[in-house]
A protein has these predicted regions:
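Membrane transport/envelope proteins' first extracytoplasmic loop
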Residues: 2-298
Length: 298
């Protein structure tokens, strides 16, 4: 039998060579198909992320952790900050940037120099970490990171806040019910008006105009003055974790989606906490599409 097969192979050697080459090519295609499929899946996920950015003008890798505080819950803000810090490690994706924001409920205040046109409205005080590196001062100057010798705290406002709150450059306002640790009323002075320095900067999850009722002061100074349990005003925090969307692997789409669901469920089960994962629906749709595409490729 073996001799018969050998004679056939010799007599029809070109046919057998063609079959051998065909088998080699078929094996190569079968071996490379998973790599090709992975590349297609990754391209699909990247395109979906780009489409989200174009359609919503918002960064697709964003995870927002929002703590809506109350006077009795002010001491929990650091606990929730630790939860936000764990987001990149839990998703297994490095963060391009983390933006920390602290703010308090609007508070009654009064101008130190009376104005005929003064509108006495409640004003919120807040802080954005590293805002000086991402903002452009359009009038006045950036705040100082320390209190003045007389206790005054320097703040900046958005152009909309300047109008909505009827504030003036150089104006000083006192907050009788908001005191420092020594019991002294907080006094602020508006020293600058800010806007974005780069419209494509992902740092500005919220545009300056959205801070229409809030004055911003130095982040570290805000921490020293107001991040304490005995603060007589509700203290809230928001942490924006901007995960690197380009490093999200399509191979891990299912695991990423399950982690997103875990965080969203955490926000539902914890009082005062809200968690939003911008790319959750992107991953959900990608997983569904990927199943159909893989069937086609195979």
């Amino acid at each position: 039998m073996l001799r018969y097969i050998l004679r056939k192979m010799i007599s029809k050697k070109w046919l057998f060579i063609a079959l051998l080459i065909g088998n080699i090519l078929l094996t190569g295609i079968a071996a490379s198909n998973p790599l090709y499929a992975d590349a297609v899946m990754q391209r699909m996920l990247t395109d979906d992320m780009d489409a989200y950015l174009t359609k919503k003008n918002a960064y697709p890798g964003l995870v927002s952790v929002f703590f809506n505080g109350s006077v009795k819950k002010n001491g929990l803000i650091k606990e929730n900050e630790a939860l936000a810090h764990a987001v990149p490690a839990d998703f297994g994706v490095p963060a391009r940037m983390e933006v920390r924001r602290y703010f308090m409920s609007p508070i009654q205040n009064q101008p130190l120099i009376e104005r005929d046109d003064a509108k006495i409205s409640s004003i919120g005080l807040g802080a954005l970490e590293d805002v000086a590196a991402h903002a452009r001062i359009v009038a006045g100057r950036m705040f100082d990171g320390e209190r003045r010798a007389d206790g005054t705290v320097e703040v900046i406002v958005s152009q909309r806040a300047l109008v909505e709150l009827n504030l003036l450059m150089g104006e000083r306002r006192e907050f009788p019910k908001l005191t420092d640790a020594d019991g002294q009323p907080i006094v602020i002075e508006v020293v600058g008006v800010y806007d974005v320095s780069d419209v494509e900067d992902p740092y500005w999850v919220r545009s300056p105009s959205s801070y229409k009722s809030e004055c911003l002061l130095d982040f570290d100074l805000f921490n020293r003055l107001f991040v304490r349990e005995d603060l007589p005003v509700a203290l809230s925090g928001c942490w924006y974790e901007l995960l690197d969307a380009e490093q999200m692997s399509a191979r891990n789409a299912q695991a990423l989606y399950e982690t997103a669901l875990k965080y969203q469920e955490m926000g539902k089960n914890r009082q005062y906490l809200t968690v939003t994962v911008a790319f959750s629906d992107i991953l959900k749709n990608h997983i569904s599409q990927a199943r159909r595409v893989r069937v086609t490729l195979w």
